[in-house]
């Protein structure tokens, strides 16, 4: 039975964390103490120093030789069960997809163990539970977050290959990635492919950063983007971002802005014949509302500076081609004209600053490209949630699922038709090597990787031969790690204050996400724990830790790879607000 003293211990451990979070929220939302730029600096300090040193402190002081193998087995079994079920669902169900597999896996199995779990479980069950939480943290940092990177990069590789080599992917013998490319996700790092057929008749592909990325930097600056959304960092993968909410629960279709344009141009391949940029018209065109944005150029110009006026004669649509029977040939797309402003300045300057405006008419280039007519809108409002709220075609374009049938816009008058998806992918060895390279580049840029591995190695050595860390090093680390917990919660409060909405994905989706986080995860953990033989207090600890709020790192990955970031944002923010009463309910019920 839970006593008043037990409840007080829990409150003593948790209230200070929420005080730090509320102070940060009020500093931005109510008192306007911090600007978005300053918030970005604080978050960067937390990501680079506070959290990695906090992880190192907990891991290095935990004795790995006394780890509870059954507890670790229960946690591992829970994640494997969820992953297996989601994999079967994604392959057997028409509504399944790799994106939803990743998102649901994150929601159900990856809680905020480091920041919330250790102090909460210590307050509930004592010091030994803190050691159990450290074991979970080690597995998360070294195994499960790495697995998520594998899935994200696999998704990016499939999209890249499906878009650039829809008919010849099976003939690819090698894929070489330039050293400055750190992700295959073209929405974040604008990349292009170059293919060469060698004497063996196989295709050899080179992936490199697109030259358009430099123009994109300055187009964003000239369009007046501010620093409310901190720039993603290749260094940490642990930044806290301000999320731009989308209309659909699953953010697929987007307005055709400069970033989208350069992503399309940047990922072009010169393998097949095409236009000057090598843009291929795929079977699954993406919706665009570029013409709506272009309808009011004066308004945008008055706000962001003077732009050279487009040439109406050059922008006139071409006449439709005549078919053999004399009738106008049905076109499922139209010509899109864009005027690109480029600059030769250094691309490493501030992207989001309010610097000089670029209005040099001589630097303007006209780009003409074919854009397919948009599909009929899905009509899914924020609250209308289903796994099928995006078409099968769009799922094929995004996830590259060769087993799905893409519903494309084809035929006369834009009537929908069916186009088979690519049926071949590069050999498994080529894909495996490609993904391993990209994941390795991600890991070596993440300070949490180093802190976890160094902490684990140090603990293995010092507890084996009874070494003690030199006092000067210990105090140098502790002076920052002691602030890590409070700064992590403070950073989370800043993140919450920067969001336009606490519930960014709609009420129905938020309810579903909370059910997965606080009901499905603990239920699967309970089954896995009982299966491996956990009983008593260990079983209670396993269930309560599975009911912790959503981890922040999965949201960072979701934002970085554009895979349901609104859902993960809601899970982090709203989940943090309701986590304490929910975990207390679990604590009380399990103690009866």
Swiss-Prot record:
Key words of the record:
Auxin signaling pathway, Membrane, Transmembrane, Transmembrane helix, Transport
Q: Which residues bind (indol-3-yl)acetate?
A: 51, 112, 114, 145, 552-553
Primary location recorded for the protein, binned into one broad class = membrane
| GO terms for biological process, alphabetical | auxin export across the plasma membrane; auxin polar transport; auxin-activated signaling pathway
Outline which residue ranges sit on the Extracellular face.
1-6, 60-70, 122-131, 474-476, 533-537
Q: Which residues lie on this side of the membrane: Cytoplasmic?
A: 28-38, 92-100, 153-452, 498-511, 559-571
Q: Does the keyword Amino-acid biosynthesis apply?
A: no
Cell compartment(s), UniProt:
Membrane
Query: According to the UniProt entry, which residue ranges have a biased composition of type Polar residues?
Result: 224-236
Transmembrane residues, as ranges?
A: 7-27, 39-59, 71-91, 101-121, 132-152, 453-473, 477-497, 512-532, 538-558, 572-592
Q: Where is the composition biased (Pro residues)?
A: 309-318
Q: In which tissues is it expressed?
A: Expressed at low levels in roots and leaves. Expressed in roots, stem bases, stems, leaves and young panicles.
Report the membrane topology from the UniProt record: Multi-pass membrane protein
Q: Which InterPro entries match?
A: Auxin_eff_plant (IPR014024), Auxin_Efflux_Carrier (IPR051107), Mem_transp_PIN-like (IPR004776)
The Gene Ontology terms for molecular function here are: auxin efflux transmembrane transporter activity; identical protein binding; protein homodimerization activity
Region annotation (Disordered) ranges: 214-236, 282-331
A GO CC annotation recorded here is: endoplasmic reticulum
By sequence similarity, the record places it as follows: Belongs to the auxin efflux carrier (TC 2.A.69.1) family.
Q: What is the role of the protein in this entry?
A: May act as a component of the auxin efflux carrier.
On subunit structure and binding partners, the annotation says: Homodimer.
Q: What is this protein called?
A: Probable auxin efflux carrier component 1c
């Amino acid at each position: 039975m839970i006593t008043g003293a037990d409840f007080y211990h829990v409150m003593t451990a948790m209230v200070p964390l929420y005080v730090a979070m509320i102070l940060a929220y009020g500093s931005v939302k109510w008192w306007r103490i911090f600007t978005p730029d300053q918030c970005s600096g604080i978050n960067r300090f937390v990501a680079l120093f506070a959290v990695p040193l906090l992880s190192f402190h907990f891991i290095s002081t935990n004795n790995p030789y006394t780890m509870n193998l059954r507890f670790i087995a229960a946690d591992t079994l829970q994640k494997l069960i969820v992953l297996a079920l989601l994999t079967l669902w994604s392959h057997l169900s028409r509504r399944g997809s790799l994106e939803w597999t990743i998102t649901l896996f994150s929601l159900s199995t990856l809680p905020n163990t480091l920041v919330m779990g250790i102090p909460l479980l210590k307050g509930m069950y004592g010091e030994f539970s803190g050691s159990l939480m450290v074991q979970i943290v080690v597995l998360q940092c070294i195994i499960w977050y790495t697995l998520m990177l594998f899935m994200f990069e696999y998704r990016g590789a499939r999209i890249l290959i499906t878009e650039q080599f829809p008919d010849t992917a099976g003939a690819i013998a090698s894929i070489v990635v330039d050293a400055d490319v750190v992700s295959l996700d073209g929405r974040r790092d604008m990349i292009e492919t170059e293919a060469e057929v060698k004497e063996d008749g196989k295709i050899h592909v080179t992936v490199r950063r697109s030259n358009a990325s430099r123009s994109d930097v300055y187009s964003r600056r000239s369009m007046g983007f501010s620093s409310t959304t901190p720039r993603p960092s290749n260094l940490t993968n642990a930044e806290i971002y301000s999320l731009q909410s989308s209309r659909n629960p699953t953010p697929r279709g987007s307005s055709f802005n400069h970033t989208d344009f350069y992503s399309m141009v940047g990922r072009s391949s010169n393998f097949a014949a095409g236009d000057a940029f090598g843009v291929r018209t795929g079977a699954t065109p993406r919706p665009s509302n570029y013409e709506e944005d272009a309808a009011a150029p004066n308004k945008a110009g008055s706000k962001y500076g003077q732009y050279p006026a487009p040439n109406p004669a050059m922008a006139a649509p071409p006449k439709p081609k005549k078919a053999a029977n004399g009738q106008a040939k049905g076109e499922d797309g139209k010509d899109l004209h864009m005027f690109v402003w480029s600059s030769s300045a250094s691309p490493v300057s501030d992207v989001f600053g309010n610097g000089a405006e670029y209005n040099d008419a001589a630097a303007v280039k006209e780009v003409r490209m074919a854009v397919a007519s948009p599909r009929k809108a899905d009509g899914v409002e924020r609250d209308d949630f289903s796994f099928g709220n995006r078409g099968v075609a769009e799922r094929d374009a995004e996830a590259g699922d060769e087993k799905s049938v893409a519903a494309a816009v084809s035929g006369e008058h834009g009537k929908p038709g069916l186009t088979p998806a690519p049926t071949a992918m590069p050999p498994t060895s080529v894909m495996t090597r490609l993904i391993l390279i990209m994941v390795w580049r991600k890991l070596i840029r993440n300070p949490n990787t180093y802190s976890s591995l160094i902490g684990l190695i140090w603990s293995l050595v010092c507890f084996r031969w009874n070494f003690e860390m030199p006092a000067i090093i210990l105090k140098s680390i502790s002076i920052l790690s002691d602030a890590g917990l409070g700064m992590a919660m403070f950073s989370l409060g800043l993140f919450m204050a920067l969001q336009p909405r606490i519930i960014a994905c709609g009420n129905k989706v938020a309810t579903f996400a909370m059910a997965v986080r606080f009901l499905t995860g603990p239920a699967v953990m309970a089954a896995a724990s009982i299966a491996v033989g956990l009983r008593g207090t260990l079983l209670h600890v396993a269930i309560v830790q599975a009911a912790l709020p959503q981890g922040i790192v999965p949201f960072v990955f979701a934002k970085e790879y554009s895979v349901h970031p609104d859902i993960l944002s809601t899970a982090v923010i709203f989940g943090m607000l309701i986590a304490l009463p929910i975990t207390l309910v679990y604590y009380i019920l399990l103690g009866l």
